[in-house]
Each structure stands twice: as C-alpha cells, then as structure tokens.
C-alpha cells in the first residue's frame, strides 16, 4: 500500500531521496492531495540557488550541466538537476536523453537527478517543474539546475 502523501512531508524535509521522488511523481501525476503537502513544504523553501539552462538540441546543455555539477560538488555543495526532456510521442513520458548523458553523476550522494517530460506543455517546461524545484529546495539542496 502506498504511503499517503501527507506522510511524505517529514521524510522530504529530511532529504529522503525516495520520499522526494515519490512526492515529485505524485505532483506530476496530478494527485489532488499534493497541494496541502506542498503548501507545508513550501514554508521551508527559499534557500537554494536555482539556475535554468536552455538551448537548442545539441548545443551542449548536458555537457555544461555535467561540468557545472562536478565543480559545485568539489566545493562540497549539493545539487539537484531537473532535466526537462521532450515527451515521447508513444508513451507521453520523458525520452531521458539528458539523464543518459549524466550517468556518472547518479551514484554521487550529493546529486539528485530527476527527468520530467514536457507532456505537451508550451515553452519546454513541464507543468510540475516548479513544484519539483520547491520540493528539492525544501529538502535541502544547495543548488537546483533546470
């Protein structure tokens, strides 16, 4: 039986990776019970630096992110990456190209990478991305890259 959304608040604020991923998944899926939990979590947000990176395909975004994450980690700071990928025309999910190019970062305990599909949202930003940033901010990451 899945953990109720309201029971994810404390583990998320404690930086529990599984709870963070579950809450982001529920936000992406549009679960109606997320709003109350997000409102509580939002009170703890506002400490992270958030940087958005955009560009045409093949312009080096993933390479830049990978290099930037390495540099920030050498300073001992934690980093979360929200990789917004185009949606697959077949599944509606993320194509995951960015995540594949950043595989060496996934085993670093100071790095959290989450891919999100645009799911048809205009402007290339998934609808749940801003909520994901708030969740990651409240969970204690120093830097969040989108």
What is the predicted role of each segment?
Residues 51-53:
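Hydrophobic anchor at the beta1->P-loop junction of P-loop NTPases
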């Amino acid at each position: 039986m899945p953990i109720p959304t309201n029971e994810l608040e404390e583990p998320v604020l404690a930086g529990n990776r599984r709870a963070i991923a579950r809450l982001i998944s529920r936000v992406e899926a549009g679960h109606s019970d997320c709003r109350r939990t997000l409102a509580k979590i939002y009170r703890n947000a506002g400490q992270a630096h958030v940087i958005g990176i955009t560009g045409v395909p093949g312009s080096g975004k993933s390479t830049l992110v990978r290099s930037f994450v390495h540099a920030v980690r050498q300073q001992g700071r934690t980093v979360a990456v929200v990789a917004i990928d185009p949606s697959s025309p077949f599944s509606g999910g993320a194509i995951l190209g960015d995540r594949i190019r950043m595989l060496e970062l996934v085993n670093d305990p100071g790095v959290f990478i989450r891919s999100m599909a645009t799911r048809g949202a205009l402007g290339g930003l998934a609808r749940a991305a801003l909520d994901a940033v708030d969740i990651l901010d409240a969970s204690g990451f120093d830097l969040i890259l989108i």
